């Protein structure tokens, strides 16, 4: 098996997973703290998707910590297949949620100027949360590509 940056059970893999956890948690926190987000399906999907990403990344980060402390190898083909499929699923969900939320945010801020008509709406927070979710997707894409290349 190849040893690459971001491999499971390495310090770089742990840093990648912790980055995914941090951006997912920040995206959820910013979105949930904004006013009236729950009335829009795309924003609820973003919170659900980032919640799944947070759980998945935290679980794999804990597994990385365990492997680093025990100096064990997590690169068996069965584990790598599981990690690859899980990373691809969570990365695609994160991308879909980020894109749909970005579409709604652009519609509110640029196209209809709904944010100017409704000053109580937290459009700046929507934009920050969407930006964090795109950064989360970028980290998830790196992780999923790394897993795929280690697997083949």
UniProtKB/Swiss-Prot annotation:
Do you know which InterPro entries this protein is assigned to? CASP_dom, CASPL-5
Entry's Pfam families?
CASP_dom
- Primary residence: membrane
Provide the membrane-side ranges marked Extracellular in the record: 33-42, 99-131
Q: So which domain of life are we looking at? A: Eukaryota
Signal sequence, renumbered to the chain: none
**Topology of the protein relative to the lipid bilayer:** Multi-pass membrane protein
GO cellular component assignments = plasma membrane
Where would I find glycosylation on this chain?
39
- List the stretches on the Cytoplasmic face of the membrane: 1-11, 64-77
Keywords recorded for this protein, A-Z: Cell membrane, Glycoprotein, Membrane, Transmembrane, Transmembrane helix
Spans through the membrane:
12-32, 43-63, 78-98, 132-152
Q: Provide the free-text tissue specificity comment from this protein's UniProt record.
A: Expressed in leaves, exclusively in hair cells (e.g. differentiated trichomes and immature cells).
**Compartmental location:** Cell membrane
Subunit structure, as described in the record: Homodimer and heterodimers.
Family to which the UniProt record says this protein belongs: Belongs to the Casparian strip membrane proteins (CASP) family.
Q: What is this protein called?
A: CASP-like protein 5B1
Q: What is the lineage of its organism?
A: Eukaryota, Viridiplantae, Streptophyta, Embryophyta, Tracheophyta
């Amino acid at each position: 098996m190849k040893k690459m940056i971001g491999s499971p059970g390495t310090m770089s893999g742990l840093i990648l997973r912790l980055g995914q956890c941090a951006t997912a948690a920040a995206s959820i926190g910013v979105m949930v703290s904004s006013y009236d987000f729950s009335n829009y399906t795309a924003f609820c999907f973003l919170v659900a998707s980032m919640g799944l990403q947070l759980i998945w990344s935290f679980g794999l980060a804990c597994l990385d910590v365990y492997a680093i402390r025990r100096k064990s190898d997590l690169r068996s083909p069965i584990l790598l297949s599981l990690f690859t499929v899980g990373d691809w699923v969570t990365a695609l969900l994160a991308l879909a949620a980020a894109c749909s939320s970005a579409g709604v945010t652009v519609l509110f801020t640029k196209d209809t100027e709904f944010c100017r008509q409704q000053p109580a709406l937290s459009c700046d927070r929507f934009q920050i949360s969407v930006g964090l979710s795109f950064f989360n997707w970028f980290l998830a894409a790196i992780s999923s590509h790394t897993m795929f290349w280690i697997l083949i």
